[in-house]
UniProtKB/Swiss-Prot annotation:
Name of the protein in question: Putative zinc metalloprotease Rip2
Record: residues binding Zn(2+): H60, H64
Chain's gene name: rip2
Keyword Oxidoreductase included in the entry's annotation: no
The keyword Zinc appears for this protein: yes
Cellular component annotations (GO), alphabetically ordered: plasma membrane
Amino acid sequence: MSETGQRESVRPSPIFLGLLGLTAVGGALAWLAGETVQPLAYAGVFVMVIAGWLVSLCLHEFGHAFTAWRFGDHDVAVRGYLTLDPRRYSHPMLSLGLPMLFIALGGIGLPGAAVYVHTWFMTTARRTLVSLAGPTVNLALAMLLLAATRLLFDPIHAVLWAGVAFLAFLQLTALVLNLLPIPGLDGYAALEPHLRPETQRALAPAKQFALVFLLVLFLAPTLNGWFFGVVYWLFDLSGVSHRLAAAGSVLARFWSIWF
């Protein structure tokens, strides 16, 4: 690969930069809405949350890819995983469309995108770190957004901060979901290197049913209550009221008022 090609394989893609810009535009609209619930407020929070969530999906997968690259899998650069281009991360519908649908229907940050990294030559500890890198990004984003809300919240711009709080809430749902030891998710991938080879082979077919397991989690009242109990507990540790995130959810999912 030429030097120019190498630079392009790690340079942030125009699409990712466009998503960042769109997030900023949504934030600006929410800021201009002030504290008044009006069409501008719904539009601003919707754009900020959806674009911001896509940005976080790219950063999550970049976390996996960059960690793998640091540990020796330099093919991730060739595959474009270090460009933060959402088109590089698996199937567009399953990786991007499905998470958007889950946000629209239930306000849940579903992990969707995926990068394929080579970890077979890595130590057990490094394989685990590669798997945990993505959820770590979600945790860092949640902490950053909640810290900003806690320190900078101004009732005059309540619409903006409601959207920021909801985006942080989505990061925490993604964190908890990803850490579940369900085959196909990061939590299981972090544990898999520590399992016996025969156990790994026995559980491998279950990875294709990860979405089914998640649907059971969301539809079973007891499991659903446990899941959101953990998410709300983590959210409340920040000192930010989860009612602010609930308000942001209503603004981002404005159709839920009527349906």
